[in-house]
Regions:
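Short, structured beta-strand/loop micro-motifs enriched in basic residues and often containing a Trp
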Residues: 66-74
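Conserved hydrophobic positions within beta-strands
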Residues: 32-36
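Short nucleic-acid-contacting surface segments enriched for D/E, G, S/T with interspersed K/R
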Residues: 73-90
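OB-fold/S1-family single-stranded nucleic acid-binding modules
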Residues: 95-120
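Short aromatic-glycine-enriched beta-strand elements
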Residues: 42-53
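Short boundary/loop segments of OB/S1/cold-shock single-stranded nucleic-acid-binding domains
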Residues: 16-30
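A short macromolecule-binding patch
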Residues: 55-67
Length: 121
């Protein structure tokens, strides 16, 4: 293999690893309800840090990854969509490891009272 070929292969593997969704259990989505602690609308991916009551009723912070801001904007999200203290209900694809986290589905996100977080345009 040439040096250029090896460099391309290494770059392609790194890019694929960055964009991999293998860590999320897409076959078993779950709903989480909690209080937004932090909302980051930044590249390369947006994040919601959500305080959720654990099995023992103690708060656990879930780290939820979203799409990139450009994709989220097309779904109606912005840097002002959520703020700390908002109570939300999110459909997520949980981490396969069982750690408190996952990927949230922007079109299946509501405030705790059932109002949609964003209205489709």
């Amino acid at each position: 293999m040439s040096l250029a070929g090896a460099a391309f292969a290494a770059t392609a593997c790194a890019a694929n690893a960055h964009h991999s969704i293998a860590m999320f259990d897409r076959d078993h989505p779950v709903e989480v309800v909690g209080i937004v602690q932090e909302y980051r609308f930044s590249s390369p991916h947006a994040f919601i840090f959500l305080e959720v009551k654990g099995a023992d009723a103690r708060p656990v912070i879930w780290r939820l990854e979203g799409n990139n801001p450009n994709s989220l904007t097309w779904d109606g999200w912005s840097n002002k969509t959520l703020k700390p203290g908002d109570e939300v209900r999110l459909m997520i694809e949980p981490l396969r490891s069982g750690a408190p986290g996952g990927a949230w589905t922007p079109k299946k996100a509501t405030f705790k009272d059932g109002r949609p977080i964003v209205v489709a345009h």
